[in-house]
């Protein structure tokens, strides 16, 4: 018997409306809609709902805010909001699998990096998902270091792998070492 994961267990972060709708169905089935709403609150605390509309190609995701009518298309909130939605949906839909996220910080302001990492790490733990994320952003790594500093219990759940073409293998920085590397300005990207 073959050991390891099959390709069916591996998911790439997708912004495709059909993929996001399928992921949303998994969220609804598991009654995890509050997690998705909480993820979007990283960028806008007033958000209180997310709705997927049936049968529409454009503007199929609407976001509601407290005391604001009507709900608005998610595109009205920018790329960062769409990215957080896609990440939170993928974490639920990839249950017991592996999620690959390229340039995880794209569209997000540096001030929300710690919260974004909290979403990813806690969501991965809840869904038993192994996440591989790439970045070229020092602010993104710094946000991960801040998360580990504020939540040392998460240190065993994260690591940074520095890949350099001149090295035969990646350099691993354990979770508890990330805050130290950031404080010492050690290049880890």
Please annotate each region the language model reported.
Residues 1-87, 92, 98, 158-189:
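Phosphate-coordinating catalytic segments in nucleotide- and nucleic-acid-processing enzymes
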Residues 118-189:
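C-terminal lobe/lid and adjacent interdomain/linker elements of RecA-like ASCE P-loop ATPase modules
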Residues 83-86, 115, 119:
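Well-ordered alpha-helical segments embedded in enzymatic catalytic cores
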Residues 102-104:
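Walker B catalytic acidic pair
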Residues 95-96, 129:
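Short coil/turn segments at beta-strand junctions that form active-site/ligand-binding loops
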